[in-house]
Each structure stands twice: as C-alpha cells, then as structure tokens.
Amino acid sequence: IIENYDKLDKHFDVSFMSTINSLNIGKFTQLKKDIGHRKWNQGSVIVNNRPYTLSAIPDDVKEIYLNDCFEFGMIGLINYLEDSVYDEKVMTELMQHCKRRDTLRGTYLPDVFPEWKKYYEKT
C-alpha cells in the first residue's frame, strides 16, 4: 500500500483516508508510524453504525488507546475517546458481531486486538 501511495503521489495529490471506529482507533498510532510523512486524513467517526461506535470501548481499553494518542499528540482522537461514553450493550453486540465474522473468516479478533480478549472470551 505504501509503495502504491508513493507511486501515485508523484503524479497526483493523494492522501490516506480512514474512518474511525471502536476497533481501529487503537491502531491509529501504528498507522501514523507506518505512513510516516505521507498525508493522512483521519476521517470521520462511525456514529450511526452500531456496534462499531466508540461507545463500545470499555474504560480499560479506552485508557490504553488514550495513552497511545497522548504519546503521539493526536488531539482529535483524544477528544473523540474522552467524549465517548461506554455502553456495555453496544460492546456485547460488537463482540458478537466479531465472533460471527471470525467464524466465517477463520480468524480470531484478539490476534489483532489483544486488548479486547477478555471481552471477546466473555461474550
């Protein structure tokens, strides 16, 4: 992906664009490291697509994400996280949805998002 970006960037005005949801917000600091100096628009927050809203993030997971965001000075993400209010029902829906997808794909969510393991296993 990075290689393709660099090829296109020589001829076009390109940038990375990503939505922000309850799972990927925890990977944005890694994404920032990976894309380096390249243009990146953090995108829009998922607000009406339950269960992927930020309200699915339990407080202990949110704390991990906030620490990462503070380290990188990602003020917009910090504000989104701080403004979100945890809703256990939404989190349970998210974990159930992820489990169904994992069954179909032969994947395991905690392999990519280990901070969610106790919630995934409990659901």
Task: Give short role names for the model-derived ranges.
Residues 1-123:
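Radical SAM enzyme [4Fe-4S]-AdoMet core and its adjacent flexible, acidic
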